[in-house]
Amino acid sequence: MNLKEFNNLTDLFFYQAERQNPDDIFLEWLNTINRKKYSWSQTVSCIYKLANKLKNYVQEGDRVLLVSENRPEWLITDMAIMLSSAITVPAYTTYTENDYKYLIEDCKPTVVIVSNNEMHKKLEKTINQNDFIKCVIFFNNLAKRDTKKKYLDFEIIVKDNLLEKDKIKKTNSKRTSPACIIYTSGTGGNPKGVILSHGGILNNLEGAKEIVEPLIDKRPIFLTWLPLSHSYEHTVQFVQIVVGAKIFYAEKIEKLLDNISEAKPTIMTAVPRFYQNLYSKININMKKATGLKSQLIKATIHFGRKNLLKEKMNFFEKLINSLLDILVRKKVKKQFGGNLKAFVSGGGALDKEIGEFLNAIGLPTLQGYGLTETSPVVSCNPIQKIKIDTVGPPFKGNEVKIAKDGEILVKGENVMLGYWNNEIETKKVIRDGWLYTGDIGEIDPKDGYLKITDRKKDIIVSAGGDNISPAKIENLLSNSAEIDQCMLYGDKKNYLVALIVPTKEFKGNRDKIAIIINKINENLTLTEKIKKFHLTEENFSIENGLLTPTMKVKRNKVTNKYINILENFYKK
């Protein structure tokens, strides 16, 4: 498969569909109440029928808003929208009514596709206020409405007969045509609509294919659980098509471990917060081990790290490490279905200690780097050579360089077409063809591996002018079993302070948290040391607006909420 030969993403899909057994299950939703399966042939049929229906309401370049949890119909709808020459605008299900209002009024969709009545409630008022919305399609639970708007049922659409002559078999979309507008969740301000092209995503798939193919020896299985409205998982669905995978959709985060056991994925993608939680849980269980079991675990981590870091091992050490593959690592993998070849981490920086630990215990973890604006992947570690403190070499077609101030710049087909309705912001970040990422990094001259050192706008500059990386210190805090979440504060101040969300067992235990902070301070420079801290009972969450949908802390929102407490630290 030569991805350079495809003009658009629908051409890619139909090319792959023609080469699959039409009766093989392609998509499966692990929903206990509404379990669904679609074979390759059923998926193709549904795409044709939905695209045909959409053509009654959209013209080339029109936007279609898609609001749904992860489920098979998500991929079907995305493909149908593109086949009708429209542009998919995916939106998070966790958005508020005001968020949806902003998105709808910004991108002006002709059609809104929503999963069910519950999700529709947050959109209904804005839908009724805007005449540019011609049609609303529900996946299920369509209730009758007294409205001029046209409401349609997905299930009825895909059951209708469609004559061969009425099938839209090809779209006019070119590689330079917009495929989707993905609104960045952002850690501050209104979200910006990132316009990604068909060619940008196809370009990204070339690099992804090189990462994934060495991990595959038979038809791969993926478990999709990150929101498909995020650029990371959105592009992963096309990677799944490229390799002819079977795709399972997780029911919900609370059922994730059960879903992993059932799906037995070959590859899993996740964000750093997932690995942080996993690290904490495994560590807690390992600390409970005694006797021989404890010794085996310690040896597994020790020799696993040596192997990962390419440190020399004698024959005896190599033999022990091989035995530990059977005695320990195989059992660890079995907890994730037994077929897992690799985790792929993206959507934020993975802590070095966590990365080393997971790789050492038998869970290969490949850290990558990207932005929504780069479709989204810039680079990723290959399984053949993992350098855990880096994000790997740049993907094919990605040109990467470091500016004088350390900022990472990216050029290539994968770079966005621009921000929707926002030429001013577009010109700020794309200059002379280079995307200014806002991330600080360095490139290893020996092998071209990229290393991220910080987020430019997150760097804290002390009153004395010292640059402090909050991510480094926050990772040290969050790696403690007693601390669930945290955020540093201290820009233009004489010292740093911290907001700490302890784990359930340590809520209000100020003395224990103080001991942990003092221990961490021992290994920090004078300007990095945390002088004061505040314990908060409330977790940072997506629901309270303090986390992005990919579980990154919204620094400005947290700061605004706790500003009086934070500023009071400097008055005492």
Predicted regions and their residues:
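Conserved pre-ATP/AMP-binding loop-to-beta segment of ANL
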Residues: 23-25, 161-183, 190, 215-221
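Conserved AMP-binding/adenylate-forming core of the ANL superfamily
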Residues: 26-58, 62-75, 79, 96-101, ...
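Conserved AMP-binding A3 loop
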Residues: 37-41, 179-205
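Structural core segment of the AMP-binding/adenylate-forming
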Residues: 83-156, 504
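AMP-binding/adenylate-forming catalytic core of the ANL superfamily
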Residues: 112-114, 402, 412, 417-418, ...
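Conserved AMP-binding/adenylation subdomain of ANL enzymes
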Residues: 202-221, 228-329, 339
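Conserved AMP-binding/adenylate-forming
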Residues: 268, 324-450, 456-459, 473-474, ...
